[in-house]
Amino acid sequence: MADEAIKNGVLDILADLTGSDDVKTNLDLNLFETGLLDSMGTVQLLLELQSQFGVEAPVSEFDRSQWDTPNKIIAKVEQAQ
């Protein structure tokens, strides 16, 4: 999958989960500090990433600091491809 498709797919998932388009315009926005993503949203995010991109990220191994901005999430998905 092309990087642009991954980026747009991840941003669409984040916008749907957070209810905010800010995630599409500020890719360094801290999703947890701003309250846009919580633990339940994190589980939903991981399920969506697995479903759409085949990314395996067990909740038990989830390190919030590695997944706290749209840019970091996009990079994780790209690495998994």
Curated annotation (Swiss-Prot):
Cellular component per GO, a single term: cytoplasm
PROSITE patterns referenced in this protein's UniProt entry, alphabetically: CARRIER (PS50075)
Protein location: Cytoplasm
GO MF annotation terms: D-alanyl carrier activity
Positions of modified residues (O-(pantetheine 4'-phosphoryl)serine): 39
GO biological process, alphabetically ordered: cell wall organization; lipoteichoic acid biosynthetic process
Family annotation (SUPFAM superfamilies): ACP-like (SSF47336)
Protein keywords: Cell wall biogenesis/degradation, Cytoplasm, Phosphopantetheine, Phosphoprotein
Pathway: Cell wall biogenesis; lipoteichoic acid biosynthesis
Main location as per UniProt: cytoplasm
PTM description: 4'-phosphopantetheine is transferred from CoA to a specific serine of apo-DCP.
A Pfam family assignment: PP-binding
The Carrier domain, residue ranges: 1-81
NCBIfam families: dltC, PRK05087.1
Protein family (similarity comment): Belongs to the DltC family.
The protein's role, per its UniProt record: Carrier protein involved in the D-alanylation of lipoteichoic acid (LTA). The loading of thioester-linked D-alanine onto DltC is catalyzed by D-alanine--D-alanyl carrier protein ligase DltA. The DltC-carried D-alanyl group is further transferred to cell membrane phosphatidylglycerol (PG) by forming an ester bond, probably catalyzed by DltD. D-alanylation of LTA plays an important role in modulating the properties of the cell wall in Gram-positive bacteria, influencing the net charge of the cell wall.
Alphabetized HAMAP family for the sequence: DltC (MF_00565)
This protein's name: D-alanyl carrier protein
Originating organism: Lacticaseibacillus paracasei (strain ATCC 334 / BCRC 17002 / CCUG 31169 / CIP 107868 / KCTC 3260 / NRRL B-441)
Gene: dltC
